[in-house]
């Protein structure tokens, strides 16, 4: 069973056009939904060479809830589009979609290394990906792009809501004692409470939940 990908738009556009498109697509993102009958979860990450301009996207599929590796799909190519804050998906999405096309199994939900609604125009890479795949996607970022939050306690499981322009856009979650927290936000077709619960379910003592930890290793070709 192959992952079905919608044809939302092409990639030949200026930054100004991309921003306008983000505002349009953000209206289609769903921040509602819960998951049931879960057996597979995917993690997705993209690695970039600092010298050659090449990128490598990796998607890993793990069994849920035991987190055993089921499948790895990679896609490599040139990333000539420079990184522009807020437009990350226009640099990384073509490689990501190619990697998803290579999957033989269909994940029930996806963890994406990046923002979802915690984005200036409410369309980070996790939300953009969710619209292409029409699947539940959770944004799980290692750093903040927008928003303010109250300090967290040191214990694993402590959290603080993330607000941007007085709107709740995500949650800052500490997944391991004494390490920097993760920035969780809705990507598509899932509510924030469910997203945070599933991220916590996927953690096994590391800062990153297992799907993203494996995706990071796969993108760097370490697994």
From Swiss-Prot:
Keywords: Cytoplasm, DNA damage, DNA repair, Endonuclease, Hydrolase, Magnesium, Metal-binding, Nuclease. Pfam families: Endonuclease_5. One of its GO terms (molecular function) is single-stranded RNA binding. Mg(2+) binds at residues 45, 113. Its cofactor is Mg(2+). The keyword Cytoplasm applies. Belongs to the endonuclease V family. This is Endonuclease V. The lineage of its organism: Bacteria, Bacillati, Chloroflexota, Dehalococcoidia, Dehalococcoidales. The gene is nfi.
């Amino acid at each position: 069973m192959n992952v079905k990908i919608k044809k939302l738009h092409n990639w030949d556009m200026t930054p100004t056009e991309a921003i306008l498109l983000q505002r349009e697509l953000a209206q289609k993102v769903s921040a509602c939904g819960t998951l049931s009958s879960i057996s597979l979860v995917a993690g997705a990450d993209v690695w970039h060479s600092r010298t050659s301009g090449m990128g490598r996207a990796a998607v890993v599929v793990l069994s849920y809830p035991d987190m055993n590796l089921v499948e790895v799909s990679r896609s490599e190519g040139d990333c000539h589009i420079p990184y522009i804050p807020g437009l990350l998906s226009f640099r990384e999405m073509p490689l990501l979609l190619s990697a998803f096309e290579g999957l033989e199994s269909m994940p029930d939900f996806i963890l994406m290394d990046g923002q979802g609604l915690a984005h200036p125009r409410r369309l980070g890479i996790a939300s953009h990906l969710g619209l292409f795949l029409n699947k539940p996607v959770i944004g799980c970022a290692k750093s903040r792009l927008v928003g303010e939050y109250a300090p967290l306690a040191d214990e694993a499981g402590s959290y603080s809501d993330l607000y941007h322009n007085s709107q709740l856009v995500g949650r800052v979650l500490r997944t391991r004692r004494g390490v920097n927290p993760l920035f969780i936000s809705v990507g598509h077709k899932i509510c924030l409470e469910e997203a945070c619960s599933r991220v916590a379910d996927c953690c096994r003592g590391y800062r990153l939940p297992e799907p993203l930890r494996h995706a990071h290793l796969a993108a760097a070709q370490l697994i």
